[in-house]
Amino acid sequence: MLLRTPTGRDNPMPTQLLMLPPQSEKTREWGTRLAAALPELDFIVAEDREQATEALAHAEAAFGTIPPDLLRHAQRLRWLQAPQAAPPAGYYYPELIAHPVAITNFREIYNDHIGAHVMAFVLAFARGLHHYIPQQLRREWKKLPQDAGVIHLPEATALVVGVGGIGSEVARLAAAFGMRVIGVDERRRDVPPGVAELHRGDELDALLPTADFVILTVPHTPETEGFMNRTRFQEMKKTGFFINIGRGLTTSLDDLVDALRAGEIAGAGLDVYEQEPLPADHPLWTTPGVLLTPHTAGYGPYLDERRYEIILDNCRRFLAGQPLRNLVDKARWF
């Protein structure tokens, strides 16, 4: 479907942006809204691969996922908006990385929702809910000793691994509860509000033993795959808690289960997993001290409107020749 303004001698052919398949009611709506807001652009909503292949010969910009066999038709493509904040494994491949196309993503739209989810895990562990929830299911009235099962947050340290938008929001919220926040980030050099110390990635192993909560927010990249393993869990405090809301492939679940059952860490809160859905027979389901949510940390209001605003902003920047928002380092996948 082509959403186009009339052309003529005084109105030359506009730049084309292709909405790659598959389409949804939302992407079709975006195409209509963008066409009304930006008459300088043609918006082509491709319903199938045949339409996408034909349109790619002329499109200078696109939204969605482009597989290798379609990429070879994209001779004019200069900008690709990824459909996620952190696209899944396989989105970036050698031919796409080598292609001159610039890629942007939807990072920043989930910061407040995921930040709140992380603090839900932190507060649950700090107040011993990982002990009391199983007791509730057993209808068992049993209090932990008054001085046990509680972490006084103003005396606790949170180690936030990955201090981008989400990590920065986690740091701000944790600091508001009085926690001392240490950040680890490969790229960031400015220290965001709430972070007491900011370190490089090669300092992580030395910092793990200092943290009461290790909070992983990093994306899945070649460098972070299997990032949290048995060795790193053993470096944590035995009273420490691990939280992962980044990407599942960054953490070895077998190693996590072994560490939990060996008493090497006190508990774990997970929203992402190596395999999703998490298989019903996975030992993580029955491992004590674990809180699991089914990849819902980013759920919340306003997400679709935030996505649209980023696309609209980047369309305007693209037309004006300005730097694009949320530009990705393709070789590093984020």
Give, region by region, the residue ranges found by the protein language model.
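Glycine-rich, N-terminal phosphate-binding loop of Rossmann-like dinucleotide-binding domains
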Residues: 21, 66, 84, 216-219, ...
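Rossmann-like dinucleotide-binding domain for NAD(H)/NADP(H)
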Residues: 239, 245-334
